[in-house]
Amino acid sequence: MERQADKLSVTASAVIWFGAAVSVAEILTGMLFAPLGWRMGLLAVAIGHMIGGMLFYLAGLIGAQTGRSAMETVQLSFGRRGSLLFSAANVVQLVGWTAIMIFTGAQAAAALTAGWSGAQTVWGVIIGALILLWLRIGMRNFSKINLVSMGTLFALTLWLSVQVASGEPAAAGQADAEAMSFGLAVELAAVMPLSWLPLVSDYTRRAGKARAATLSATLAYFCTSSWMYAIGLAAALFAGQSEIAPMLQYAGLGAAGILVVVLSTVSTTFLDAYSAGVSFHSISSRFGEVVVASAVTLLGTLLALVFDVSRFEGFLYFIGSVFAPMIAVQIADYFVLKRKPASGEVDWVSLALWLAGFVFYRLMLKWQPPLGTTLPVIAATFALTLLVRKLLPSVGKAAVREG
């Protein structure tokens, strides 16, 4: 039984997810919305985050109510071995996110210290080392340190917002990004909270108050992530900036800009690395969570130093195609059908339902529906799961292979 001191408070939950949402990657993604203009761009951000935020809350609530990690909640629907597919996919996406976050953070910090020789490499190593230090501190002490660092980050981000948004609207003409449909923009907003679905229960499982802590995490992430997208959009439209470093310089944030970049990168990437350890532990318990998280940090740092990973839209769509249908099956099973945990090693019906959703997602990307891809995929997979489980129960029972 977990000690009360180890429980995550409502405030601590919000602070963690505020830190997760303040990231260079989210600002960069917001910059891509510039072709839509200010009003339509913000509308796409809001709709996408509402879709992703709803799924974020439901995924986190399953973990909070059951006390299970994210990948352990996946086992409830897909079976012990069936969940390994998603554990492996999650580790892969987290290694990818670690590399992307360290790369973009180091690139921005390097541009602010352009006089340094090999500045990007140096900052990449510094950020990687700080993430390792955060991992050594551990989750119990992390929330205490994070409260101080996030307070600093909040103040700096407020200043950044005011400076970026104070530009002349006429500068919007300088933003000359590739044309983007409204539906594609909604999807790019939805997949950012969607990327946290395989992680959120790793933290909400420790919640002292399941619903309240999960709601505070969801609202903190929803509001802050939307804010980051809006900063990126405003930077592109009103300040004529399409990269992080010039934007920070435009806002008059020299050394403070470096602090924003480093703090936001470390606080977000810590969660990626830690959850990679938790996910890998569900595949093999041979290595501890912190050991694996440290290895992921080192690998991500190496990838960030060797490869250019500055464009990652395709990576976001991959995440959406894997995890959107996964959570649709889980939501139907847990909240509506109230199914007992899968008794076999692999629940083939659940995997078939997921595969149908995966294929549908990839097809929908080509069609670009007006409200994005995630919403119709979730609705279709959810409805199909209810249909198969309620109207064809014999199919579900026969397809489960007992361990």
Regions found by a protein language model. Give the residues of each.
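Membrane-interface "cap" regions at the ends of multi-pass membrane proteins
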Residues: 1-40, 181-186, 198, 205-215, ...
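Transmembrane alpha-helical segments of multi-pass small-molecule transport proteins
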Residues: 16-21, 86-91, 102, 113-137, ...
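Extracellular loop-to-transmembrane helix junctions
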Residues: 31-61, 82-84, 221-223, 380
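Juxtamembrane transmembrane-helix boundary signature
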Residues: 46-78, 85-93, 389-394
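Hydrophobic transmembrane alpha-helices that form the core helical bundles
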Residues: 83-115, 266-282, 325
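Membrane-interface loop-to-helix entry segments
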Residues: 122-127, 131-164, 176-177, 214-221, ...
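Hydrophobic alpha-helical segments and their helix-loop junctions in multi-pass secondary transporters
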Residues: 135, 151-177, 182-185, 189-194, ...
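C-terminal membrane-solvent junction of multi-pass transporters and transport-like membrane proteins
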Residues: 177, 328-403
